[in-house]
Amino acid sequence: MLEKHRVLDSAPEYVDKKKYLWILSTLWPATPMIGIWLANETGWGIFYGLVLLVWYGALPLLDAMFGEDFNNPPEEVVPKLEKERYYRVLTYLTVPMHYAALIVSAWWVGTQPMSWLEIGALALSLGIVNGLALNTGHELGHKKETFDRWMAKIVLAVVGYGHFFIEHNKGHHRDVATPMDPATSRMGESIYKFSIREIPGAFIRAWGLEEQRLSRRGQSVWSFDNEILQPMIITVILYAVLLALFGPKMLVFLPIQMAFGWWQLTSANYIEHYGLLRQKMEDGRYEHQKPHHSWNSNHIVSNLVLFHLQRHSDHHAHPTRSYQSLRDFPGLPALPTGYPGAFLMAMIPQWFRSVMDPKVVDWAGGDLNKIQIDDSMRETYLKKFGTSSAGHSSSTSAVAS
């Protein structure tokens, strides 16, 4: 143990220049409350949609202005960096911030005169930041400590997506970039078509995985040890209390913010592995996932409000590695912008495809066999990109089935 400490202490001096900027990820959930304050002070209801304006407008512009950060912590300092408590505390503090955003917004809707348009704008704004509660849960849920894992469940309950805890860790990380993964999108598949199989597919896979785990322990899937039911119960209690306190408007407000929160995860899943495919080996199994099976983004500003989620390639290579330690690698497939801009592009399928499809084909070296392609778009792509895949349509058929 002493020798291990000597190794850590001898690591070269490293200064994380973004150390205190990560506070932006913790403060981001406060944005709807800032919008409420501005709307109240100015009388301009447009501020209820502040998060929409910042997320889909300001952040893509800031990403374009400030560009990318390719700096990595030296590998030898990563163990020491992982142990620095400050970074973990920021994720803990983010959990009550999400609850504050939900409760304050619900209180305002339930007690103040607002038009339905204003209520809708605030619900969508809250949906964006609470969709990113999934990102907070993602960071905490990959940790081994019981406290962290419970914090993940608690924050996932805010947006009613408790099954993410099981689905992402045990399902997506196992099946990513294969046809078995409902959370991997296919080239040519619009985000709207993707959502129809991704949202129910994620729940079905998560429930099946948890049922198998409990069965091996001789327990019913309806046991309180079910890690999907635990956050679901918190959600039901939380929403029931908000309904009792703030009235029937919650019957509209809460489902809208929840649905748009789910849409944020769908958007992330859609862009993170679009078209990418792990190849089958001779034994019929898929190759081990590698960093190049995820789309990466080093855009500075959006990474600072997302706990480095956009360094997704290293995350899949090292799932338990904390956000401050995630690295970039040369030659990784890269998104043209950060997640906010990519989410916006994804909602306009023609725009997204015009930018991303050539990138996917380039990633595959021009071989369409190495790409997950939506079955309805295969002939279109064969005509558009041609190349060596024309005689091997069986691979793409399997991909899209």
UniProtKB/Swiss-Prot annotation:
Residues 40-41, 112-113, 250 are periplasmic. Changing residue 168 to A: Loss of activity. It catalyses: octane + 2 reduced [rubredoxin] + O2 + 2 H(+) = 2 oxidized [rubredoxin] + octan-1-ol + H2O. It holds the Pfam family FA_desaturase. Its cofactor is Fe(3+). Belongs to the fatty acid desaturase type 1 family. AlkB subfamily. This is Alkane 1-monooxygenase. The lineage of its organism: Bacteria, Pseudomonadati, Pseudomonadota, Gammaproteobacteria, Pseudomonadales.
